[in-house]
A protein has these predicted regions:
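C-terminal compact regulatory domains
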Residues: 1-129
Length: 129
C-alpha cells in the first residue's frame, strides 16, 4: 500500500516511543504530526482543517487526558471529519473488555503494545485506501 503523503496524528506521552513511531512512520512516507497527551490531540484536531488528518494513532494511558477520553471528545466535535477519521489506539491491555471500551469510545482499532510497526502500517493502509 502506498502511504505517501498520508497525514497521521501520533499521540504518545512517552518520548522514546513517540520518536520511534515518528521515525518508522516517516520512513514509510507518512506525514506525521505529534501530540503528547489526549487534550493536546483534541486541540490540534479542532484547529486543523477538516480532513487534514487521515488517521489518528493514539496511546491509551496518558496524563492530562487519556486516549479513550480524547477519542470521545474528537468524535463529539461538530465537524464532518470528527466521526469519520480512523482512530487507532495502542495499549498494553488488549483484553476483551478493554477492546469493548475502545469501541464504545468510537475507536476503530485497538492494537496491543509493544508496537509491531509492520502491523501498524498494515492497519493504517487498511483504513486509508
Amino acid at each position: 500500500a502506498d502511504l505517501t503523503d498520508l497525514h497521521i496524528l501520533v499521540v504518545e506521552d512517552n518520548e522514546l516511543n513517540l520518536e520511534i513511531a515518528v521515525f518508522s512512520l516517516e520512513a514509510a512516507g507518512l506525514n506525521v504530526s505529534t501530540a503528547i497527551n489526549g487534550l493536546e490531540a483534541v486541540q490540534l484536531f479542532e484547529k486543523s482543517k477538516p480532513y487534514e488528518y487521515d488517521i489518528i494513532l493514539m496511546d491509551i494511558m496518558m496524563p492530562v487526558m487519556n486516549g479513550l477520553d480524547a477519542a470521545k471528545a474528537i468524535r463529539g466535535l461538530s465537524r464532518p471529519d470528527a466521526t469519520t477519521v480512523p482512530i487507532i489506539v495502542l495499549s498494553a491491555n488488549a483484553f476483551a473488555e478493554d477492546i469493548q471500551k475502545s469501541k464504545n469510545a468510537g475507536i476503530n482499532e485497538h492494537l496491543a503494545k509493544p508496537l509491531e510497526m509492520d502491523k501498524v502500517l498494515k492497519v493504517i493502509a487498511s483504513y486509508c485506501k
